[in-house]
């Protein structure tokens, strides 16, 4: 994507932070405007995360202007807001490739740039990483500064507060910037806080404050009185008491779209000792009216024309698996008021908007707190309620101990609706749902289901709802369903029983999940038997023994890591019965899968029809 210098005269001069720092401060306002316009244009071409980046343009410019990056360490939490950072750190001309196969990574990524000091994608990790870097910076004594940027959503995660607590205790030199795009403050209060922030971050205030501490060191009563007076005065206009109590010097809130004000405040704070906390107010979607009005809807966008001020119309088509879940949840809640559903800040993505509106007393958003969400469900189940935890596969990893200790160990009937199982595509390695079958299969008392289509998915949700002997999980992929007819009537499936889908000879394909259509297509060319296993745990042992006895070769197919997955379960069972046959496991290899289109990734992994057939033929010919 070449840069039209006539439209971006200053941005053309700031390809890297080193070039940015050569510009006069008076040019930063225009540079920010050009950067925001370039972001609009580039995301319109590429698709991707949108509203968050529009809100951090001025902050990004100010941070790279004040801090000596990459020597100074800058860590972005999650990374949705880091597109301006990528543009200013040598990747401007590749922005049209972001989230595409062999293109720029969707998040800051250490392997991609020296300016990406910590690879991210999941929430609430930045402060812990920054503290680790601050500790080592002190040991090296090179004068390196460390900054973590975290949003008001990510800071709700427990890990962020654990890190804040530890950072306050260790008292290392570091800065945490809270990008707050939720709170609304009036202009008067905002102006007061902007002035107060400059005053309190300035050298005069800091010198008086630290000098006063030394003078009053021998007079503890007066020192305590002075401390309380300062806290009281700050508390009247500054909502930062919590962070002060954690050991941080709190500054703010200030206007996050005043680039010159940010530069002044950051310049003052850069050399302050100990943990610093800067609270800035921004507007998600800043500078693009549709995104300002609907920041959730414009959080991530497909390719679009920014001049049209609307996203392209969605073509009517098949429902997504998330929508199938949302409809089932509404249907069952209408019949049972003891159904309580939980999501860790993924209402829209998990298909729960309608449910939250129709059944607000049965809906719980636990925020970005997966550990809490899982154990909250355990608490519901203890009291005889039916807990449904809707969670992404890659995020359930963060509540793994709770899944084992708080749910499975107590055999609590919590139903996990695990979205984004398998390949998710453009969000890349941090979000691929490659491990859930493996990490759940080893947990005692778990029932794990993998539907082959949307109707089977609906019936499995009902099966989990009816199951009261312990926890159950239904894992399903991102995106559109298969087009199977959905049967409104809900019927509980027999636990641990698969079904035959095609009778063939010599080769038996044991399919787990939505790869069934590809497996059936491959089976036509191979004249292979196909079984829709349905249950990863417990396995249909009778069906496995029957297929092993009547076929020469067994093949397992799953959109999950081969290591420890459903195929491993089949192999373990047959070995325990001394009924081993040549067995090919088809799935995700032992590597992190990069970003790209889901179809092209599945094809590359050999998980489409041609790939399944090719792998089976190669296995037979060995």
Swiss-Prot record:
Name of the protein described by the UniProt record: 1-deoxy-D-xylulose-5-phosphate synthase
SUPFAM superfamilies documented for this protein: Thiamin diphosphate-binding fold (THDP-binding), TK C-terminal domain-like
EC number, UniProt record: 2.2.1.7
Swiss-Prot/TrEMBL cofactor(s): Mg(2+); thiamine diphosphate
Keywords assigned: Isoprene biosynthesis, Magnesium, Metal-binding, Thiamine biosynthesis, Thiamine pyrophosphate, Transferase
Cofactor: record remark: Binds 1 Mg(2+) ion per subunit.
Residues annotated as binding Mg(2+): 152, 181
Keyword Protease: no
């Amino acid at each position: 994507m070449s840069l039209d210098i006539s439209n971006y005269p200053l941005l053309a001069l700031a390809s890297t932070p080193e070039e940015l720092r050569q510009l006069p401060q008076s040019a930063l306002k225009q540079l920010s405007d050009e950067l925001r316009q370039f972001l609009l244009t580039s995301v319109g071409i590429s698709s991707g995360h949108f509203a968050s980046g529009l809100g951090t343009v001025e902050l990004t410019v100010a941070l790279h202007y004040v801090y000596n990056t990459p020597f100074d360490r800058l860590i972005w939490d999650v990374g949705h807001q880091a597109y301006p950072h990528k543009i200013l750190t040598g990747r401007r001309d590749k922005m049209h490739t972001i989230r595409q196969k062999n293109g720029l990574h969707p998040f800051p990524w250490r392997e991609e740039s020296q300016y990406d000091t910590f690879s991210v994608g999941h929430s609430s990790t930045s402060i812990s990483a920054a503290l680790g870097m601050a500790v080592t910076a002190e040991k090296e004594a090179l004068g390196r500064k460390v900054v973590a940027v975290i949003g008001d959503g990510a800071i709700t995660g427990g890990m962020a507060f654990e890190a804040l607590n530890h950072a306050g205790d260790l008292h290392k030199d570091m800065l945490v910037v809270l990008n707050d795009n939720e709170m609304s403050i009036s202009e008067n209060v905002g102006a007061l806080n902007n002035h107060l922030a400059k005053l309190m971050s300035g050298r005069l205030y800091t010198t008086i404050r630290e000098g006063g501490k030394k003078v009053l060191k021998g007079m503890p009563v007066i020192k305590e009185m002075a401390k309380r007076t300062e806290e009281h005065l700050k508390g009247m206009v500054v909502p930062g008491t919590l962070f002060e109590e954690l050991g941080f010097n709190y500054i703010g809130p200030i206007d996050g779209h005043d680039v010159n004000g940010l530069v002044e405040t950051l310049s003052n704070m850069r050399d302050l000792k100990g943990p610093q906390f800067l609270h800035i107010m921004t507007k998600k979607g800043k500078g693009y009216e549709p995104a300002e009005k609907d920041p959730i809807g414009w959080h991530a966008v497909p390719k679009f024309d920014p001049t049209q001020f609307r996203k392209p119309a969605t073509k009517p088509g098949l429902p997504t698996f998330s929508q199938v879940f949302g409809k089932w949840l509404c249907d069952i809640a209408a019949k049972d008021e003891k159904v309580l559903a939980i999501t860790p800040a993924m209402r829209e993505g998990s298909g729960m908007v309608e449910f939250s509106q129709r059944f607000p007393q049965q809906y719980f958003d636990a925020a970005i707190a997966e550990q809490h969400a899982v154990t909250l469900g355990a608490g519901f189940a203890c009291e005889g309620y039916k807990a449904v935890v809707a969670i992404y596969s890659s995020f359930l990893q963060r509540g793994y101990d709770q899944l084992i200790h708080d749910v499975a160990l107590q055999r609590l009937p919590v139903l996990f609706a695990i979205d984004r199982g398998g390949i998710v595509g453009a969000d890349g390695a941090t979000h691929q749902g490659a491990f859930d079958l493996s990490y759940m299969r080893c947990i005692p008392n778990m029932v794990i289901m993998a539907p082959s289509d949307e109707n089977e998915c609906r019936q499995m949700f009902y099966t989990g709802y009816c199951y009261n002997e312990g926890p159950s999980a239904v894992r399903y992929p991102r995106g559109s369903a298969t087009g199977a007819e959905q049967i409104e009537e809900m019927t509980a499936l027999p636990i641990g029983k698969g079904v035959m889908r095609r009778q063939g000879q010599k080769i038996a394909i044991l399919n787990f999940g939505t790869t069934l259509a590809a497996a059936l297509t491959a089976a036509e060319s191979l004249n292979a038997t196909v079984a829709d296993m349905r249950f990863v745990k417990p396995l249909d042992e009778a069906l496995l023994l029957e297929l092993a006895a009547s076929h020469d070769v067994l093949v397992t197919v799953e959109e999950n890591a081969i290591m420890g997955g459903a195929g491993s379960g089949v192999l373990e069972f047959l070995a325990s019965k001394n009924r081993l046959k040549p067995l090919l496991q088809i799935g995700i290899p032992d590597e992190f899968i990069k970003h790209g289109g889901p179809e092209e990734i599945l094809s590359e992994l050999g998980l489409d029809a041609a790939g399944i057939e090719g792998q089976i033929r190669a296995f037979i010919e060995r």
